């Protein structure tokens, strides 16, 4: 094989050579800017390697001459890897002579290396002699100064290194715009004795080709860290508390530890300090006193020292679980079941939390049945077999847990009652029967005596009482009790004692209901300021209807709180619309002398609870089920209809959200909870004048900035409610704090389009969130647009749509009745286990009502009082979907 170097170009005649072998390779390197063409043409190097040096950015052309082979497959190789450069050219000089060219138009440092060409012949690879290509340029940095954070006046070092070719390379250091060192050979280390403020450093590298400047490094001063924030008690028990916090700015020094101080509040003098390494930024406080108020604060430290303490954060440990078991558990058989009674448990120590419901467990056929939750000290057991022995136990519970179980009560299949003792003991039924008969006779006698006395008092009042101290006869008269709903003198007198305004009393006169006219039942939900209970209301025809009673807590004694609570009822009294919750009545619960009565607002019983809890249950409940898009749009139409009615009556709601919309038995949605609503008597806006708990993430921009509320601000909240519905109950602006919402919105950000949300629906949402209130659509426009969208969707079959389930009113279900929903294997229960879709199943909000499966029979004449509407809502939506009703437009 012959090797020759030349500046050969395409068409260059081959140089005279001895007769070549079967295959010959020739590699030539052309540096057109280094050698003139005339000088290169006569260059002949036989078989010797070549070193080629070029400047960065110059062109280079390499060629390879192959003789003794037809159409060779010439490959270029650099440092052992095949070159993928597309700028390659292969030219035949003769049938047995080919020249290949590899062009590098602008050489970079990465192009430097060892090149050769190779050809395969008969399974063997022939390679040429190599060419070493060296690329020269300005220095290239391999190490540059890095940013640092150092204590004030503390010494530190900065490093800089650069390489050629060409060598040598020298380093010059700069501090800002001042030269402070060099030139020094590369690599170079700069020693600095210290700085008192943030300072910038850089280095320059010089060689024969020029100079290069490094990045600018900033040396920051370390400082004490900032105070922690977002201190939260994440988990509480009677003796332990888990605390988490977010660290403040670390002062550009690694945080090493945090200190948590805890003291009893108020006025605690002993402070417990716990030092924990970080991260994580959490701490577990142990050995706390149950049912005790504490305060804690946190600070963190780096190498320079500790941060300031954050503000004190109060918390209270939970009380102890009940320590006593119910006593005197006994049973009475009746035709309808087995009545169980026991003595009420009284807390033994102030550290025990408030006692809650009782839990009853019963065993039959050696199998434990489900536990029952019972309010009060009496339970009626119906789901047992009277032909088999029964064992019953009961305990009391509170927020912490359950107390000890009572002694088991054995009810034999041969006995008429049970006895307390070991599971296999027996008792005679004769004494029990005699005791029951005696109790019945005594109760009947007392009832007759009380009835006779009551008739006299009602007829004449109570007169001619005891004489006064001076011996003179005195006549006392107590007004006869009246149960006439039209003139409830007793309740009116009690209203006078509340100190509420005369205007509010006048509004409530015709909706006052005597306390004796309804019976309170089980607890449906609790909130911060009150609770909701099921009740049976006796109507004028003697029949009973199930209602929900919303009442304030017994320890709320301020007249202002009571008046604010009753104002919501007065507000609801004015509403009469199928998609707006309507007031049934108002009552007062009497208490001991000297204590204010408890106000109660009576509302329709909504079988399926609040819309937010229903949406959550469909997505993350124990048995999730599917809600079709048509159903979700139908929910929005109902809410828009209700808000259209409210806005037409000059009412602004101010708290529109999915949690404040209720689901009736036929699955229609009603707008409810008017605790923040206001009527606009003049103009079209209301300005908030005092501090209240407001739903920040549902508020419009003008409400956040200026406490200004209009119908247009309700439209904004309706857009957020639409987003809640489409996401099946997700929290809006998740991960954004309330204090950050205004800046987030003013920056042009809005809630993102939910998955599976139609573009038309999201466009409506986005219009509701316009920064200019005048650009937001009205509720009439929203209702018509949503009806148009619903009309374009396919009609659901009865098996697909939960709205078609129980549209016709069926028999009233028993307590704990259920509703079958698509995709659910088991019915959901009532308030018993908290797992249903009513509000009882979730975390109760601020006395939100109503919410657990049940039913409310339609009141006679109710339809006559509803405002005239074009069609029943369900009929109108079905006609829209089937194209039988023309769509209106905004």
Swiss-Prot record:
<dbReference type="GO" id="GO:0042698">
    <property type="term" value="P:ovulation cycle"/>
</dbReference>
<feature type="glycosylation site" description="N-linked (GlcNAc...) asparagine">
    <location>
        <position position="293"/>
    </location>
</feature>
<dbReference type="GO" id="GO:0043548">
    <property type="term" value="F:phosphatidylinositol 3-kinase binding"/>
</dbReference>
<feature type="modified residue" description="Phosphoserine">
    <location>
        <position position="818"/>
    </location>
</feature>
<dbReference type="GO" id="GO:0030168">
    <property type="term" value="P:platelet activation"/>
</dbReference>
<feature type="binding site">
    <location>
        <position position="550"/>
    </location>
    <ligand>
        <name>ATP</name>
    </ligand>
</feature>
<dbReference type="GO" id="GO:0032940">
    <property type="term" value="P:secretion by cell"/>
</dbReference>
<dbReference type="GO" id="GO:0005789">
    <property type="term" value="C:endoplasmic reticulum membrane"/>
</dbReference>
<feature type="disulfide bond">
    <location>
        <begin position="160"/>
        <end position="203"/>
    </location>
</feature>
<dbReference type="InterPro" id="IPR036179">
    <property type="entry name" value="Ig-like_dom_sf"/>
</dbReference>
<dbReference type="InterPro" id="IPR000719">
    <property type="entry name" value="Prot_kinase_dom"/>
</dbReference>
<feature type="domain" description="Fibronectin type-III 1">
    <location>
        <begin position="227"/>
        <end position="320"/>
    </location>
</feature>
<dbReference type="GO" id="GO:0016477">
    <property type="term" value="P:cell migration"/>
</dbReference>
<dbReference type="GO" id="GO:0007283">
    <property type="term" value="P:spermatogenesis"/>
</dbReference>
<comment type="function">
    <text>(Microbial infection) Acts as a receptor for lassa virus and lymphocytic choriomeningitis virus, possibly through GAS6 binding to phosphatidyl-serine at the surface of virion envelope.</text>
</comment>
<keyword id="KW-1015">Disulfide bond</keyword>
<comment type="subunit">
    <text>Monomer and homodimer. Interacts (via N-terminus) with extracellular ligands TULP1 and GAS6. Interacts with PIK3R1; this interaction increases PI3-kinase activity.</text>
</comment>
<feature type="domain" description="Fibronectin type-III 2">
    <location>
        <begin position="325"/>
        <end position="416"/>
    </location>
</feature>
<keyword id="KW-0067">ATP-binding</keyword>
<dbReference type="GO" id="GO:0060068">
    <property type="term" value="P:vagina development"/>
</dbReference>
<dbReference type="InterPro" id="IPR017441">
    <property type="entry name" value="Protein_kinase_ATP_BS"/>
</dbReference>
<dbReference type="GO" id="GO:0043524">
    <property type="term" value="P:negative regulation of neuron apoptotic process"/>
</dbReference>
<dbReference type="GO" id="GO:0004713">
    <property type="term" value="F:protein tyrosine kinase activity"/>
</dbReference>
<keyword id="KW-1003">Cell membrane</keyword>
<dbReference type="InterPro" id="IPR050122">
    <property type="entry name" value="RTK"/>
</dbReference>
<keyword id="KW-1133">Transmembrane helix</keyword>
<dbReference type="GO" id="GO:0034446">
    <property type="term" value="P:substrate adhesion-dependent cell spreading"/>
</dbReference>
<dbReference type="GO" id="GO:0050728">
    <property type="term" value="P:negative regulation of inflammatory response"/>
</dbReference>
<dbReference type="Pfam" id="PF07714">
    <property type="entry name" value="PK_Tyr_Ser-Thr"/>
</dbReference>
<feature type="glycosylation site" description="N-linked (GlcNAc...) asparagine">
    <location>
        <position position="191"/>
    </location>
</feature>
<dbReference type="Pfam" id="PF07679">
    <property type="entry name" value="I-set"/>
</dbReference>
<feature type="disulfide bond">
    <location>
        <begin position="64"/>
        <end position="117"/>
    </location>
</feature>
<feature type="binding site">
    <location>
        <begin position="524"/>
        <end position="532"/>
    </location>
    <ligand>
        <name>ATP</name>
    </ligand>
</feature>
<dbReference type="Pfam" id="PF00041">
    <property type="entry name" value="fn3"/>
</dbReference>
<dbReference type="GO" id="GO:0009986">
    <property type="term" value="C:cell surface"/>
</dbReference>
<dbReference type="InterPro" id="IPR013098">
    <property type="entry name" value="Ig_I-set"/>
</dbReference>
<dbReference type="GO" id="GO:0005635">
    <property type="term" value="C:nuclear envelope"/>
</dbReference>
<dbReference type="GO" id="GO:0006909">
    <property type="term" value="P:phagocytosis"/>
</dbReference>
<feature type="topological domain" description="Extracellular">
    <location>
        <begin position="41"/>
        <end position="429"/>
    </location>
</feature>
<dbReference type="GO" id="GO:0051402">
    <property type="term" value="P:neuron apoptotic process"/>
</dbReference>
<dbReference type="InterPro" id="IPR007110">
    <property type="entry name" value="Ig-like_dom"/>
</dbReference>
<feature type="domain" description="Protein kinase">
    <location>
        <begin position="518"/>
        <end position="790"/>
    </location>
</feature>
